[in-house]
UniProtKB/Swiss-Prot annotation:
Residue stretches making up the AGC-kinase C-terminal domain: 356-431
Chain ranges of the Protein kinase domain: 98-355
Family listed: Belongs to the protein kinase superfamily. AGC Ser/Thr protein kinase family.
Region (Disordered): 65-92
UniProt name for this protein: Serine/threonine-protein kinase Sgk1
Keyword Cell membrane in record: yes
Protein's cellular compartments: Cytoplasm; Nucleus; Endoplasmic reticulum membrane; Cell membrane
SUPFAM superfamilies: Protein kinase-like (PK-like) (SSF56112)
GO biological process: apoptotic process; cellular response to aldosterone; cellular response to insulin stimulus; DNA damage response; positive regulation of sodium ion transport; regulation of protein localization
Biased composition (Polar residues): 81-91
EC number: 2.7.11.1
UniProt superkingdom: Eukaryota
Lineage: Eukaryota, Metazoa, Chordata, Craniata, Vertebrata
């Protein structure tokens, strides 16, 4: 009986281990999902929902965050509730202006495609979103916020630029800078971790981008390796501004529960008001991952990972310099009022000894040679994109002209909900 019981336990352990590995692989593939999708997936797992820790942290049995959980159903938006950002230029753009060549990314509401403008012969990354999917999850506010932030980003070298936007009856189109050096996530997967000088360079460019957003009273809220791109020379480009919060002044706070699980700051998990320092926590988490290969409090068990973020002391292995250790301890301070950046925001980060070798004027002017060159041969070089995306066929509907779309009641509702989305740069802009 003892031998049989032991054998049964061994079999169970092996099976469970295989399951955990499969879950981890799937989880890593789905890190690109927003927190909404991630939590909905957890909530649909009966086994996970039984854990008191999961119920406590996510409050699954008593949803109180309609913006996160979509717990309170509401009727379709009436005309008075429709989003209207005011007058904007009409670019007269349409899908048939482009050759859509390859899928280079995917998200909750659509795809990102490499496209060539037929008249200009210029390559762009075109983010195409399904209006009905956005409306179904009540995410119009975040999409419009992303558009607003993109309009402010055009003057900063480490933030992706919006060239113009337009819409059809059923889709939204963001025409963005095409960046083909790969996601930081992709390079971390291949190399596991970076040497400290390389991590310092990336952290400095990321901090510069975050500092610029903060100067515009914008909190980014979703810094992670998947949202950090490398351009063709190896410089950082921050992208995906859907979770940005606008109008947060120096001492201002917000309380929406959002972000990506591995990078959530303690105050966000506690559902307390939080401020700009949430971005400095995320910078610390990304820097830690660049140096060590995993986020600082990572666990395969989500509830355990959240408990680690809230309660576990930061553990730093000895293979980094004292200045890197000091910076990580300052950024990953659980008390946001004591966190590095709490007093003087970006200026505190900029003046830290870890960055003493960085000439910030040269950095912002891209006069510092990046430590890694993606060595892309041109716009059609897709070696740094996941084949999972690039091998997917381009949907024919993406390039379809508006006249060919059947305008149903739901399509009309979707079209009206995004009045003011279209944008064209002024004639005297850099474009």
């Amino acid at each position: 009986m003892t031998v049989k019981a032991e054998a049964a336990r061994s079999t169970l352990t092996y099976s469970r281990m295989r399951g955990m590995v499969a879950i981890l692989i799937a989880f890593m593939k789905q890190r690109r999902m927003g927190l909404n999708d991630f939590i909905q997936k957890i909530a649909s797992n009966t086994y996970a929902c039984k854990h008191a820790e999961v119920q406590s942290i996510l409050k699954m049995s008593h949803p109180q965050e309609p913006e996160l959980m979509n717990a309170n159903p509401s009727p379709p938006p009436s005309p008075s509730q429709q989003i209207n950002l005011g007058p904007s230029s009409n670019p007269h753009a349409k899908p048939s202006d482009f050759h859509f060549l390859k899928v280079i990314g995917k998200g909750s509401f659509g795809k990102v495609l490499l496209a060539r403008h037929k008249a200009e012969e210029v390559f762009y990354a075109v983010k195409v979103l399904q209006k009905k999917a956005i409306l179904k999850k009540k995410e119009e506010k975040h999409i419009m916020s992303e558009r607003n932030v993109l309009l402010k980003n055009v003057k900063h070298p480490f933030l992706v630029g919006l060239h113009f936007s337009f819409q059809t009856a059923d889709k939204l189109y963001f025409v963005l800078d095409y960046i083909n050096g790969g996601e930081l996530f992709y390079h971390l997967q291949r190399e596991r971790c970076f040497l400290e000088p390389r991590a310092r360079f990336y952290a400095a460019e990321i901090a510069s981008a975050l500092g610029y957003l903060h100067s515009l009273n914008i909190v980014y809220r979703d810094l992670k390796p998947e949202n950090i791109l490398l351009d063709s020379q190896g410089h950082i480009v921050l992208t995906d501004f859907g979770l940005c919060k606008e109008n947060i002044e120096h001492n201002g706070t917000t309380s929406t529960f959002c972000g990506t699980p591995e990078y959530l700051a303690p105050e966000v998990l506690h559902k307390q008001p939080y401020d700009r320092t949430v971005d400095w926590w995320c910078l610390g988490a990304v820097l830690y991952e660049m140096l060590y290969g995993l986020p600082p409090f990572y666990s395969r068990n989500t509830a355990e990972m959240y408990d680690n973020i809230l309660n576990k002391p930061l553990q730093l292995k000895p293979n980094i310099t004292n200045s890197a250790r000091h910076l990580l301890e300052g950024l990953l301070q659980k008390d946001r009022t004591k966190r590095l950046g709490a007093k003087d925001d970006f200026m505190e980060i900029k003046s830290h000894i870890f960055f003493s070798l960085i000439n910030w004027d040269d950095l912002i002017n891209k006069k510092i040679t990046p430590p890694f060159n993606p060595n892309v041969s041109g716009p059609s070089d897709l070696r740094h994109f996941d084949p999972e995306f690039t091998e997917e066929p381009v949907p024919s509907s993406i390039g379809r002209s508006p006249d060919s779309i059947l305008v149903t009641a739901s399509v009309k509702e979707a079209a009206e909900a995004f009045l003011g989305f279209s944008y064209a740069p002024p004639v005297d802009s850099f474009l």
